[in-house]
Amino acid sequence: MITLLTDFGTADYFVPAVKGVILSLNPQTTIIDITHEIPAQDIQAGAFTLGACYHNFPAGTIHLAVIDPGVGSERRPIIVATGKYFFVGPDNGIFSYVYHLEKAVRVFQVSETELFRHNSSSTFHGRDVFAPLAAWLSKGLTPENFGAEINDYIRFDLPRPQISAGKISGEIIHCKINFTCVPRVKPNFFAAESCHNATSQ
C-alpha cells in the first residue's frame, strides 16, 4: 500500500500523473490519498498531517509525501525506514514528526538515479523521482538498494509549551476545516506539570 500526501491540489493533472507512474511500475499496489490540499509549500502543515495519521495504516505501508519548495535544487531525495513503515520524499523536514514519534529511524539518501523516471523534469520530482521510488519499494526493494544511510537529515524542532509566571503558552499547530484549532499544549502536559509541582513542594 502507498499513501500520497501533497500540496498539488486536485484541479490539475499532477496527482493522476503520480498515480500513473506508480501503477505503471506496480499495477498490484493500492494507492490511498491522505490529502492533496496542504497549503502550497507549507512543509510544517504537511509534516503535522502526516504525523497525525501515518500510524493508522497497516504495517508495511509506504508513505509518499511531496511538499517540495526546493524542487530542482540540491536538496536530497530520501527514504525513511521505521520498524513498521517507509517514507519517501524530499529531505526538507517533511518527516519531522516521524523522527520525533518513532524510537528507531533509519534515513537513506537516494543516489541510484537509474531508478528515477527517464527524462526527469527538474520541476516535477513528485512524478519523476519520488513516485518511482515508492513503486520500487512496493515491489520489494529495500532502502539499502537506493543509497547510503545518513545521519545529517533535516528536521525542525517541535517546541514544547513554555511555563512562565503561572501561565502556559504554546503554538497553534493546525486549524481544521471546521475552524477548531489544535494546540501544541496537550491535556497530559497539565497533568505532568501538576505532578512536577506537587513533588517539588
Each predicted region: which residue ranges?
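N-terminal glycine-rich anion-binding loop in soluble enzyme alpha/beta folds
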Residues: 1-40
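Active-site flanking residues adjacent to catalytic metal/cofactor-binding acidic residues
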Residues: 6, 67, 90, 175
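Conserved hydrophobic/aromatic beta-strand scaffold that supports enzyme active sites
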Residues: 7, 77-79, 107, 172-174, ...
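Short acidic, Gly/Ser-rich segments with clustered Asp/Glu that frequently serve as metal-coordination loops
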Residues: 8-12, 70-73, 178-179
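Alpha-helical scaffold segments in soluble metabolic enzymes
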Residues: 17-21, 49-52, 97, 132-136
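Active-site histidine-anchored catalytic micro-motif
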Residues: 25-31, 37, 42-49, 56-66, ...
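Anionic-ligand-binding alpha/beta catalytic cores of soluble enzymes and soluble regulatory domains
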Residues: 119-185, 189, 193-196
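Short conserved beta-strand and strand-loop elements enriched in small hydrophobics
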Residues: 197-201
